[in-house]
């Protein structure tokens, strides 16, 4: 299941469709702003909105959670109780990226540092994918021709990240946010 019908949800759906992976779109809202667009773009997908019954949880093994969904959302608590694996698009990205990854996180300065490193790498002649919390969703960056990824990661994205080791990782200043 993909929880969150927004930019990240669309990115995950596009990736799943390319991989021929069936999916269910789920959203905690009754009328998410991009619902009609999602229904048109992904007519084979099932949609579960606002209310999540027992049948929904029994039908899924894994849930890709959009970074905008708070970690204490009751839906996530029920999913955890049911043993459903919760991941973010970050985990999928790191599993499928075939070029080195520079991952940047911290409380302040992530976008600036990500942009600067990305632009410097481009100037050196490399084909660079820049994104994550900044710019396009990570899965939209996956490309066989990319030589380097420079990714900004928010604390929300990192909460559901598993086995994500970049070639280089930078943790900028940390402060209560």
Where are these regions (language model features)?
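Phosphate-binding loop of NTP-binding sites
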Residues: 17, 54-58, 67-177
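N-terminal leader/targeting and accessory segments in enzymes
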Residues: 1-88, 92
């Amino acid at each position: 299941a993909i929880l969150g019908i927004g930019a990240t949800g669309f990115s995950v759906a596009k990736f799943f469709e390319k991989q021929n992976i069936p999916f269910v779109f789920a959203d905690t809202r009754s009328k998410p702003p991009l619902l009609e667009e999602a229904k048109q773009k992904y007519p084979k997908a099932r949609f579960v909105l606002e209310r999540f019954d027992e049948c929904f949880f029994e039908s899924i093994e894994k849930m890709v959670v959009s970074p905008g969904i708070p970690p204490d959302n009751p839906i996530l608590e029920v999913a955890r109780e049911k043993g459903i694996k919760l991941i973010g698009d970050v985990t999928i990205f790191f599993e499928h990226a075939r070029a080195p990854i520079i991952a940047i996180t911290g409380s302040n300065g992530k976008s600036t540092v990500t942009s600067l490193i990305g632009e410097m790498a481009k100037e050196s002649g490399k084909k660079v994918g820049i994104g994550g919390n900044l710019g396009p969703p990570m899965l939209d960056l996956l490309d066989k021709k990319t030589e380097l990824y420079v990714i900004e990661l928010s604390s929300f994205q990192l909460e559901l990240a598993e086995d994500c080791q970049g070639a280089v990782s930078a943790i900028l200043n940390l402060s209560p946010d």
